[in-house]
Amino acid sequence: MALNDFHVSEPYTLGIELEMQVINPPGYDLSQDSSTLIDAVKPQLTAGEIKHDITESMLEMATGVCRDIDQAAAQLSAMQHVILQAASEHHLGICGGGTHPFQKWQRQEVCDNERYQRTLENFGYLIQQATVFGQHVHVGCANGDDAIYLLHGLSHFVPHFIALSAASPYMQGSDTRFACARLNIFSAFPDNGPMPWVSNWQEFAGLFRRLSYTTMIDSIKDLHWDIRPNPAFGTVEVRVMDTPLTLDHAINMAGLIQATAHWLLTERPFKPQEQDYLLYKFNRFQACRYGLEGVITDAYTGDRRRLADDTLRLLDNVTPSARKLGADSAIDALRLQVKKGGNEAQYMREFIADGGSLIGLVQKHCEIWAGQ
């Protein structure tokens, strides 16, 4: 199967996708009513899109193409408002977080959608287990070769993005001991983790053609790498973040990725090499397991650095780019988060340590998303 030509898009434009949890009070388990909400809110949208994801307990909010984080925030805020209104009318809740802390995957209903039903046929129970919730950020690129360079550059900071956004410590009623347990769910999939090495867009087109020989790949959407190019949109898509508990944090993460993309493509601080990925999964694991307290290792020098310290260095590097893009508020907020030493996974554990229950935790998450 041939790959579409890379659609030229304006560099550094943004698109944000948030996979939200649809909750059924008063037990605060996952609901199976996303179709009801989607039908209710679609006629009210003036920008962006609200659509299905894999199962009926998932609802995806997606912006249109945005020039900056302020425009993205306005679109997401408008969608948030109509979703919350419809959820209230149907006695449902909405919240963020990378996993629901006590749902049972066996109860999840795969959406009545041709693509998802085909995926269920290919992957069986793994698809129901993939009822987890992430944030994806698209960044516009001028051409395919820039997209491949940007993908490799951003891959250096996958642990940083995971650690900052980690919000999935609980799963199936248990503390997983991970800051981000969500990404572990995908470890059984054949396309888990980093994209196979290519050095330019022509090589990527050849890679895609060979992957399509498996008959499991019909489009880019069927490849679930941590970061992937999207030729139809003319973007690079970062897919490793847990869905945050607040819209503000989602915007901050998008601002960081946009600013990092600008820094990478204007400064070209790395010469991508296949050996860059030698310790990729080890460093990714550190971020998932320990969050900002994780330790990453340089594949060339063996130097070991605490993720919190290296994240502060990244934030300093991208600050000039953030100012040019109007994303400096995002960098300032994330810098403060790192200096305070926490992420949302840590907050969740503190809630439970203070005597809260998992049911109470989900209730609190719904209140946070509703701004209560």
UniProtKB/Swiss-Prot annotation:
Keywords: ATP-binding, Ligase, Nucleotide-binding. GO terms for molecular function: ATP binding; glutamate-cysteine ligase activity. It comes from the Bacteria. Pfam families: GCS2. Its EC number is 6.3.2.2. GO terms for biological process: modified amino acid biosynthetic process. ATP-dependent carboxylate-amine ligase which exhibits weak glutamate--cysteine ligase activity. Homodimer. NCBIfam families: gshA_cyan_rel, PRK13516.1. This is Putative glutamate--cysteine ligase 2. It comes from Salmonella enteritidis PT4 (strain P125109). The lineage of its organism: Bacteria, Pseudomonadati, Pseudomonadota, Gammaproteobacteria, Enterobacterales.
